Amino acid sequence: PKVLRNTELLYDDDIALAVAEMGFHGMLTEGAKHVLGWKSPDFVYQSAVVPELHLLMRHAALSEDLSRRFCDQSWDEYPLTADKYASWLADRGKGEQVTYLDMSYDVLGNLCPASSGIFDFFRALPEYIDRAGLEMATPSEVFGQLRPEDEISVLDTISWSEEEKTTKSWLGNILQQEAFGKLVEWTERTRMSGNRRIKQDWAYLQSSDHFLYMSTAMENKDSGLYSPYGSPYDAFNNYMNVLSDFHLRVEEEYPSSIENEELNALLKTIENQGEEITALQEELHKLRAEKPAKRTGTTKKAK
């Protein structure tokens, strides 16, 4: 893969550096107004800190016409038809290159049930896009065909969440910050583990949804919409109990009485010794293969 879509479209200059170092050539993120200013999201941009990393900025309004407003009967554009939507896409400003749409799969049958016509809308949309003289393309195709219009610098992390487009939905209150802080505390020790199940559970614990469910922001519609918990406090208590159990499992493997640096040095020594043993075994096998086989035979006994 050459293009990265980060969770919740999270992006900033530090993330850009890490993503480019991983070998990606492009990234998808949010067309946040406070980042773009007077610029349109309908162009290819490049990172200000890594110019070779090209960016597509989500068109929030057109994306949320589908993800948030399609089923809203109080919306003045309701009902939204495929031909109407295609005409909106075609009415972009002159000279604009590309419109990047991004939404959760939940819009298909969950946020908008089949009875809303959402599936019929998407079945019909490609035909009306073609009639409007537009074409669809993958991010890699877009980056291969279009040159960046300008550079984008993002010092503070942006996302596609709510009006502020920040990380507030996941790290905005003391519950979320406490849970995340405890998770991060065990990063190095967990990385040292050779237990695949522990590393798998560690990845599960990093899911952004766990922290979204702890949101207490009244304006955060997604938290209450998706959360299986009765309250943010229930979500916090459940997560901390699971995290505590996880810590005990890691503790059994690598006791916290041993400092991370000391433990890392011990593991490195064991790894080096293992490599030395493997090399010696290979050398022994080679010597055995080169040693001439002992000749055997029978002689006739003299009479």
What are the roles of these predicted feature ranges?
Residues 5-9, 29-31, 57-58, 102-104:
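Short His-Asn-centered micro-motif
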Residues 43-53, 57-58, 72-75, 87-295, ...:
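Active-site and substrate-binding clefts of carbohydrate-active enzymes
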Residues 20-41, 46-54:
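Acidic, His- and aromatic-enriched active-site or binding-groove loops in soluble protein domains
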Residues 3, 26, 98-100:
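Residues at the N-termini of beta-strands
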Residues 12-22:
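Distinct, well-ordered alpha-helical segments
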Residues 1-7, 66-81, 109-116:
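The substrate-binding groove and active-site-proximal loops of carbohydrate-active enzymes
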Residues 4-11, 140-142:
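Short, solvent-exposed turn/loop segments enriched in Gly/Ser/Thr/Pro and often Arg
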